[in-house]
Regions:
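Soluble metallo-hydrolase cores and metallopeptidase-like ectodomains found primarily
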Residues: 97-129, 210-286, 294-305
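His/Asp/Glu-rich mid-to-C-terminal helical/loop segments that flank catalytic regions of hydrolases
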Residues: 309-311, 439-503
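N-terminal capping segment at the start of a domain
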Residues: 9-51, 67, 74-76, 201, ...
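Metal-dependent peptidase/peptidase-like ectodomains
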Residues: 269, 317-431, 435
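A conserved hydrophobic secondary-structure block that centers on an alpha-helix together
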Residues: 128-130, 142-198, 268
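Noncatalytic luminal/extracellular "stalk/propeptide" segments of secretory-pathway proteins
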Residues: 2, 14, 27-30, 37-159
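Short helix-loop-beta-strand segments that form the rim/entrance of peptidase-like active sites
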Residues: 35, 299-329, 486
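Second-shell loop/turn segments in exported
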Residues: 19-27, 42-51, 115, 119, ...
Length: 503
């Protein structure tokens, strides 16, 4: 203790070391973490509200209950769209391979629907010329380049070196896939169906992409096809020929569950939130729940007296159907925050969340699309971990928690606009909760893959990521709220709030 009464730097370091050691003793092994990841992946694609997703949620609930935690469920209504089969052919019978349907687009009659093809170069301002016809829209891949990254984010630490930064564009189907085509506009203009031709992406990379996942049901069938079919479709449209599209899908009213569990600490008026989502198409998207289980194990192993604050573990549903689950289309955790203010907003007798940790997409290795080869291939690198650190103190604490790692490739950043923040850490940030959120974006993030693409994950990398968050959470529990800090009120945050009020 210093003469002013503040903790001595050496005392803080000793307390951190002791707290971290205690937590790491209770942290499950790499083998156990990998077992959980394999179990989740073993359910198959866990798209929102599907039987596989429900089974995975039940499994996670049982694992938390086995720790002695009381698991609560929020039952959320969902109108679930499920695609069963697709087929596309020109009027001469030549088949056009469908890479994937656009989620929640629409459904055709059993024998499909036929219409004249109308070609559009890029996203059209108007679909009027395709009224009563099938629109074919060519979309060029948009990458996350350094300019876009600078406009959207403030880049901070590069760990362990400059290779974690973005020297060349991050090639990804995600940005173009999320934007896709304005199906609502096309439907208003009387379009019968839409074919999206994705340029700059190999057919193997495009196959099974679940994009976009941020749009509601549009009642307009739409599919992705690869660029190898572009010339055939363009030529057919120029000759005013027809095609027949079949998209067999069902709509079902059901429910889907968010889980949360509270682990009490010495004080009840301050909480730390650890969250992720449970729905996704493959082994990496979403395996964050395995990391949440690991942290729950580590902290539940401590005596209550060793936990300063109450921990709240939140596993939300709805990330892959944000229009139905998220509040005003925000990320799915926004629904949980809205329903449980007593655990975070600090008003009246409510507890205040002094910090949050969001874990997503553990253990990803880097694969990049090779158009010449016609398929993506591994680069031999770890996937760049994009880690949002909401305050300077959190950035420093995260960097300290990474010390000693042999598998590390992380770029820390903060969003200039709240909407630019990817992943389920966004609602915490929007609510003013200081958060550290990991959200790497591998090319295969939203892709249904054979065996879930689990071979693309590195178990040791996943374990070291979780160990980092265990150290970080232990340090956060030792810090006063003032030491963690508040999210700076930047011009970008003010603009985000103004936009939100105008919605």
């Amino acid at each position: 203790m210093t003469a002013t009464g503040a903790p001595d730097v050496g005392d803080v370091a000793d307390q951190d070391a002791a707290a971290q050691a205690a937590v790491l003793r209770g942290l499950p092994s790499q083998a156990q973490l990998w077992h959980w990841i394999e179990r989740l992946n073993g359910f198959g694609p866990r798209l929102t509200g599907s039987p596989a997703h429900a089974a995975a949620i039940d499994f996670l609930a049982a694992e938390l209950q086995a720790l002695g935690l009381q698991v609560q469920r929020d039952h959320l209504p969902l109108r679930r769209w499920t695609a069963h089969a697709t087929h596309l052919a020109l009027d001469d019978g030549s088949a056009i391979a469908v890479a994937a349907p656009l989620p929640y687009s629409g459904v055709t009659p059993a024998d499909g629907l036929a219409g004249e093809l109308v070609w559009f170069d890029g996203r059209p301002r108007s679909f009027r010329k395709a009224r009563g016809k099938i629109a074919v829209v060519a979309l060029r891949r948009r990458d996350l380049d350094r300019t876009l990254l600078t406009l959207a984010f403030k880049r901070k630490a590069r760990l362990p070196d400059g290779d974690a930064d973005v020297a060349s564009p991050i090639t990804t189907p995600l940005l173009t896939g999320l934007q896709a085509v304005a199906l609502d506009k096309a439907r208003r203009h009387g379009v019968r169906a839409v074919i999206c031709v994705f340029e700059g992406v190999s057919e193997a990379q495009l196959h099974g992409q679940v994009l976009p996942f941020i749009t509601p049901y549009r009642d307009l069938p739409a599919v992705w096809v690869s660029a190898r079919h572009a010339e055939a479709l363009r030529a057919a449209a120029a000759q005013r020929r027809q095609a027949r599209l079949t998209l067999h899908a069902t709509l079902q009213d059901t429910t889907t569950d968010t889980l949360y569990a509270v682990l009490p600490g010495r004080v009840q008026d301050e909480t730390l939130i650890v969250n992720t989502h449970t729905d996704g198409p493959n082994a990496c998207e979403e395996n964050g729940a395995a990391g949440v289980l690991a942290l729950a194990h580590a902290f539940a192993a401590l005596p209550r007296a060793a936990r300063r604050r109450t921990l709240v573990f939140v596993l939300v549903t709805g990330h892959f159907q944000l229009p139905q689950i998220g509040v005003h289309g925000r990320q799915a955790t926004s629904a949980w925050l809205q329903q449980h203010p007593q655990l975070w907003d600090g008003r009246g007798s409510h507890a205040r969340a002094v910090a949050g940790i969001t874990i997503e997409h553990l253990g990803c290795t880097e694969w990049r699309d090779d158009l010449a080869a016609g398929a993506p291939a591994p680069t031999g690198k770890l996937e760049r971990d994009l880690v949002y650190t909401a305050t300077p103190a959190l950035d420093a604490l995260y960097r300290q928690a990474c010390a000693g790692r042999s598998k590390l490739r992380a770029l820390t950043l903060s969003p200039r606009l709240e909407v630019a923040m990817l992943g389920e850490g966004q609602p915490l940030y929007q609510a003013g909760i200081p958060v550290v959120a990991t959200c790497p974006i591998p090319d295969y993030l939203c892709q249904v893959l054979p065996e879930g693409g689990i071979a693309r994950l590195d178990p040791a990398y996943a374990q070291q990521q979780v160990e980092t968050f265990a150290r970080l959470l232990a340090r956060l529990d030792q810090r006063d709220a003032a030491q963690i800090g508040r999210i700076p009120l930047t011009p970008g945050r003010l603009l985000s709030r103004l936009i939100e009020r105008l919605r």
